[in-house]
Design a protein with these regions (language model features):
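Transmembrane helical elements of multi-pass membrane transporters/channels
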Residues: 9-28, 131, 165, 194-198, ...
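Interfacial/gating helices of multi-pass transporter permease domains
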Residues: 32-51, 119-124, 184-185, 227-234, ...
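Small-residue-rich hydrophobic transmembrane alpha-helices
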Residues: 40-100, 139-158, 264-330, 361-385
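Hydrophobic transmembrane alpha-helices of multi-pass small-molecule transporters
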Residues: 52-55, 169-173, 199-203, 276-279, ...
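N-terminal transmembrane alpha-helices
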Residues: 2-30, 34-35, 51-63, 67, ...
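Short runs within selected transmembrane alpha-helices of multi-pass transporters and secretion channels
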Residues: 61, 131-150, 158-166, 187-202, ...
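Helix-terminus/linker motif at the lipid-water interface of multi-pass membrane proteins
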Residues: 23-41, 110-119, 175-184, 243-276, ...
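Short alpha-helical transmembrane segments in multi-pass integral membrane proteins
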Residues: 1-14, 68-135, 179-236, 292-358, ...
Length: 441
């Protein structure tokens, strides 16, 4: 169904977009390192919560994109456009429902998740959460718009917007953090501004009728329960999977937060780099959902299998390259970030251990899941990922920390166990072909 040129046009912009999106969070973390460990700790802690919430929006966008892709694959363009409208309605409503309590109850929320942290870390965290929470509706709408353009095979546009957003974010950080000396609040303001502009741009461009998916009028959107239900059948299990995954990270983060600012700062840097190393591969996974979704909609099941295998192999190669580059330059990265000596030493040591294992097991533990979800096999993915994460990451980490008094290394031992077990389960599910037996539209 796809030529090599079509795949290149879809995947290369997606890879760049994901890398650029990751840079937005990374820039905040790196730039606040210059104002102390309390600042980097605050950004790291709150971003753990932010990622949890943003992944809920991403799950909704995924549900809508899969529905749209299968409708387009079966040549039902009108229904695909209607699904897009319902996606926009859904993410707007859900984002507002989440934003309001996160702002009003941010202190008890942070205390509940992270427990007792140093006062200056908590003060910075409260400011950072208040401002970044205001951006939730805008990142939700941007995700919905970006997903629709990817489904229309126009992944270059979201990449271009992401590039502009990152430039704006960097300039904003320079102005707010260093010129106005606003600290973590400056980093948050820059992120908020860039997300508002990104959402407005993509929603404006989404009104152009020349593309496969478009919205003729936002004011005319009314809820349609049947279409929303189809989106939620994909979005809710995916959201639970993503949400539980990030919630598990928060539980682990709360354990790390009691180890002091040196461990928190080192863990934050390694976690940021680990996430960054797989962003291009995640871009391939997002492209896989579009490709496999259209194949399944057209009932081309062998093509769906073929693209899942070939794109997983490509993502594996890309992940290895990124990991190798980061391992090679980790000392320079920590120096450039201005990390304190003890935090930098710990971060370098952890990175070399973690990335050697990540090269082997990360890709097969994640990429096949994109193909499964595109075919509608979301419950299996949700159950597998949730159980593996809680048993391996959370239980193993807490056990190692409290029994053997390990530091941040315990987190990565648990994560490595999760990657390994998940890899074998997903590969077995893929070979069984049961993932192709679901009906979505």
């Amino acid at each position: 169904m796809y030529t090599k040129e079509q795949l290149r046009r879809l995947l290369i912009p997606l890879m760049f977009e994901q890398v650029l999106t990751a840079l937005m969070g990374s820039v905040d973390t790196i730039m606040v390192t210059n104002i102390g460990s309390a600042a980097i700790s605050a950004v790291s802690l709150v971003d753990s919560l932010n990622i949890l919430i943003i992944n809920i929006f991403a799950a909704m966008a995924t549900g809508g994109a899969i529905i749209c892709a299968q409708y387009l694959g079966s040549n039902q363009k009108d229904k695909a456009n209607q699904a897009l409208k319902q996606l926009i309605f859904s993410v707007t409503l859900i984002s507002l429902i989440i934003t309001i309590p996160c702002i009003l109850f941010r202190r008890p929320l942070l205390s509940l998740i992270f427990g007792s942290v140093e006062k200056n870390v908590m003060d910075n965290s409260l400011n950072y959460l208040f401002i970044t929470a205001l951006s939730y509706p805008f990142i939700a709408l941007y995700n919905a718009g970006a997903a629709s353009f990817r489904t229309s095979q126009n992944s270059r546009l979201p990449m271009t917007i992401a590039f502009g957003s990152n430039i704006l974010n960097i300039l904003g950080n320079i102005f707010f953090i260093f010129t106005l000396s606003l600290g973590v609040a400056g980093a948050a303001l820059s992120t908020l501004l860039s997300r508002i502009i990104s959402a407005l741009v993509i929603l404006t461009l989404l009104k152009q009728p020349k593309q496969d998916l478009y919205v003729d009028s936002y004011l005319s959107i009314r809820p349609e329960i049947e279409t929303i239900t189809k989106i939620l059948k994909i979005g809710i299990p995916t959201g639970i999977e993503n949400g539980m995954f990030q919630f598990g990270k928060l539980v682990i983060q709360s354990t790390i937060s009691t180890m002091g600012t040196t461990a928190i700062a080192a863990q934050a840097m390694v976690a940021m780099l680990e996430s960054f190393a797989c962003q291009a591969s995640i871009g391939i996974g997002l492209g896989m959902m579009t490709v496999v979704g259209k194949c399944v909609g057209a009932k081309e099941y062998e093509q769906a299998r073929h693209y899942t295998i070939s794109l997983t192999r490509l993502a594996w190669m890309v992940c290895i390259i990124f990991c190798a580059i980061i391992m090679l330059f980790i000392q320079q990265i920590t120096s450039l970030a201005g990390m304190e000596a003890e935090s930098a030493k710990l971060a370098i040591w952890l990175t070399r251990i973690v990335f050697a294992y990540k090269m082997i097991f990360w890709t097969p533990s994640f990429l096949p899941g994109y193909g499964l979800r595109a075919a509608g096999d979301v419950k299996f993915s949700m159950i597998t990922s949730t159980l593996s994460m809680w048993i391996c990451r959370v239980v193993v980490t807490i056990f190692l920390v409290h029994t053997f008094h390990m530091g941040p290394l315990a987190v990565w031992i648990g994560m490595g166990a999760d990657w390994t077990i998940r890899s074998f389960i997903f590969l077995a599910r893929f070979k069984s072909n049961k993932w192709l037996e679901h009906k979505v539209i």
